[in-house]
Amino acid sequence: MKPVYVVELIEDVVAKVSTALLPQLQVIDPAITAVHYQHGHPKEIIETLMQKDKSETYQFRKYPLIALFQDFPEAHNLQIGIDNEATLHLVIVNSTRPDYKAGERYVKNFKPILYPIYLEFLKQISLSGKFLNYGIHTLGHTKIDRLYWGREGLYGSEGNVFNDWLDCMEIRDLKLKINLINC
């Protein structure tokens, strides 16, 4: 039995999301070059994005981004046909402006960019064959729309989590059963 790398399975899904949505996203923002992907510890992801800021080539090729946060558990419960069940924590982020109000964020970021990426991400997971599921509506998870994504405090966000101004869809506890037959 060969090892299954969840981070690579998600990378493949994000590549398909990018292929499916890029023309639609470029109508909204011609500067979008892809739906980008990173995985790792949140601090590492932030450092990588900061390094891109120093590059003329990559400083504007960061968003939209799907980031898979590590570490995540993989339960190996010896179910026939299942390699493991991974419980994932991801974010889908896009750059924004700090002066936008909630309504503007939905009109300019959430509805045209973040929600289509979110829905296509779930669709591509469902279609991939790498995960045991029965359609998009059986992928249990918690989704949080984070307008001006910052650290949580008593009165909401108290600063940027990343160094950029971002709107975010946070996906917590996405449970994916890795289909051993197709991996």
Specify the residue positions occupied by each region the protein language model found:
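Charged, amphipathic alpha-helical segments and their flanking helix caps
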Residues: M1-P42, R61, D71-C183
